Amino acid sequence: MLARAERPRPGPRPPPVSLFPPPSSLLLLLLAMLSAPVCGRVPRSVPRTSLPISEADSYLTRFAAPHTYNYSALLVDPASHTLYVGARDSIFALTLPFSGEKPRRIDWMVPETHRQNCRKKGKKEDECHNFIQILAIANASHLLTCGTFAFDPKCGVIDVSSFQQVERLESGRGKCPFEPAQRSAAVMAGGVLYTATVKNFLGTEPIISRAVGRAEDWIRTETLSSWLNAPAFVAAMVLSPAEWGDEDGDDEIFFFFTETSRVLDSYERIKVPRVARVCAGDLGGRKTLQQRWTTFLKADLLCPGPEHGRASGVLQDMTELRPQPGAGTPLFYGIFSSQWEGAAISAVCAFRPQDIRAVLNGPFRELKHDCNRGLPVMDNEVPQPRPGECITNNMKFQQFGSSLSLPDRVLTFIRDHPLMDRPVFPADGRPLLVTTDTAYLRVVAHRVTSLSGKEYDVLYLGTEDGHLHRAVRIGAQLSVLEDLALFPETQPVESMKLYHDWLLVGSHTEVTQVNTSNCGRLQSCSECILAQDPVCAWSFRLDACVAHAGEHRGMVQDIESADVSSLCPKEPGEHPVVFEVPVATVGHVVLPCSPSSAWASCVWHQPSGVTSLTPRRDGLEVVVTPGAMGAYACECQEGGAARVVAAYSLVWGSQRGPANRAHTVVGAGLVGFFLGVLAASLTLLLIGRRQQRRRQRELLARDKVGLDLGAPPSGTTSYSQDPPSPSPEDERLPLALGKRGSGFGGFPPPFLLDSCPSPAHIRLTGAPLATCDETSI
């Protein structure tokens, strides 16, 4: 049984029930009071605050075209301040930041003949569209784009100045997947497209290629399971020699993916996250590995989870954080999940490119066919020059001017040994974040300078159910600051891009723009400091939380300790309304306590001598006895500042005093409401009885003329005599079945606290925040 009264709104009201005794006995009561914690320390993987869609909607800007879906391909052009969006059968161009203006649009539809061929191949109608998969900047005047084109991939170019149509169409096989469900990756380097996808209709031939000129002239991976074994590609990134601080090197392209391991460690197919690297100057071999990569090397990515590394089975996404020029090498942030059913684990790990390079320069692995494990190759078995290396100036001095001049023994070795023996460990040796209750799918990151000048990495994590988690990296840990609901309907985040202070999120139904520097939502100094946002600082001059932009005068901020007590002036305390909870039966009462921050540490204060208490995450469970009557208060502390969040007075029903007039008014209103319901019920009952009597007269008349009384009369529906099965509402509220037929609609009369015949948690009338747990009665 559930009955709920609304929480009284702030405003003029009678003086609340005093929670504490007169001052003369206050000290004695405080000494006698006990303190019970609400729950243990909440890990920083739990978002500190959560904004539902009703509150978050004011911080978001949305774009969606009528009858257009799958906004999954996003490309930001910082030079023109433009966001290009690839959707189903359409490509859009929006000016950033967008604010509702009409975008430019190109419709790239599939001809009906192609759609018919698609359906003849056994594909569904909804699959036979052109899903845009690749958007890349080809040069200053043109974009390169590729789409699935009803399971016949096509590529073309777009003149960005006119933005009218896709021109110079050509086959996209080997560049673009055949369907959107196939994971792929693509990146432009030096005006050249590097892709990782599948080449055939069945999706059984994976390929990593440099797609230049005719398809037969491409440089691509060998068709061997030792090179690629059922991969799911995630991302592709380019690092230049300048970013390494190595002027003698070559551009290196990194591909991140998950593939099935060929090592038989168990009877199950083991998925392994990996990184592969090729060199931009690779021309393939002269005889061996013709038109094939001679620099293709790959290594395992290790992101160990709580269950012996099982959290690292599947790589969901990878992003790069590029610092300012000359400020160091980039950093890779990846999202990992478990491949095992029932293990809902997500982990975030950071990887350094120099660690990847060190592994690629380490020992090779060889899979022995007479055993089920790979073994390292001995150093004396590795030919010279070292297989898989980019062509450097030092190699050119040794008469190896390009990969075409490499000896066959080197090419044969790299063909048979593409996998390295050692894994790549995360930058800090362990994950930055591990959670078991959130499925992360996408990640982007940028580096923010705090008020003190120290830099912090801020990550934005998109979830499977359409939420956005904002996290800041403090040392070797990620702290999730905020959970933001993005969409009115639950749907996964499909893509994300950053543009200055704006985050752009693509999903099935829309593109959502999020302001990442919206500090104005933090209304007080304590809220601003506790938010631990490197962008935001409290301005004493403006008496507001603002984006500091490097300004220091009259501002405070504390990212790592959030010490409110030393930075903010003492704010006037708000005394919560004391809710009187009348009880007249033995049972369990749950007194809720909901602090604004999940990281707050809360304790309960209750009368002395009360021992039958059970702290819960949502409040305090009290066994109702005469000795449990008295005052209860939930006090929460964070950042050195404490305040009472909730206060209750537990009394026997007969002890209600005149101070509870507000509840009396609410109760009178509820009584009037239920009396109205009773009157309506009596009216319906009288009408039903009249119809029943009319039905009986009809049956008697039919009986006289020999009619079959078992057959229903014309215009009626036959009902079985079996008892009605419980409805979904009955299953959710088991008391509805047990109490059917008593009171109004099967529920007891209001304000009655009779014992419950079946286990349930019920709301106590007259106590809008309290629940009664009758499981032990």
Swiss-Prot record:
PTM sites of type Phosphoserine: S725, S727
A single GO BP: retinal ganglion cell axon guidance
PROSITE patterns: SEMA
Motif PDZ-binding, residue range(s) on this chain: 775-777
Glycosylation sites: N70, N139, N515
Disulfide bond positions: C118-C128, C146-C155, C279-C390, C303-C349, C519-C536, C528-C545, C593-C634
Cited Pfam families: PSI (PF01437), Sema (PF01403), Sema4F_C (PF19428)
Classification via SUPFAM superfamilies: Plexin repeat, Sema domain
Protein function: Probable cell surface receptor that regulates oligodendroglial precursor cell migration. Might also regulate differentiation of oligodendroglial precursor cells. Has growth cone collapse activity against retinal ganglion-cell axons.
Quaternary structure and partners: Interacts (via PDZ-binding motif) with DLG4/SAP90 (via PDZ domain 2); this interaction may promote translocation of DLG4/SAP90 to the membrane.
Name of protein: Semaphorin-4F
Organism: Mus musculus
Lineage: Eukaryota, Metazoa, Chordata, Craniata, Vertebrata
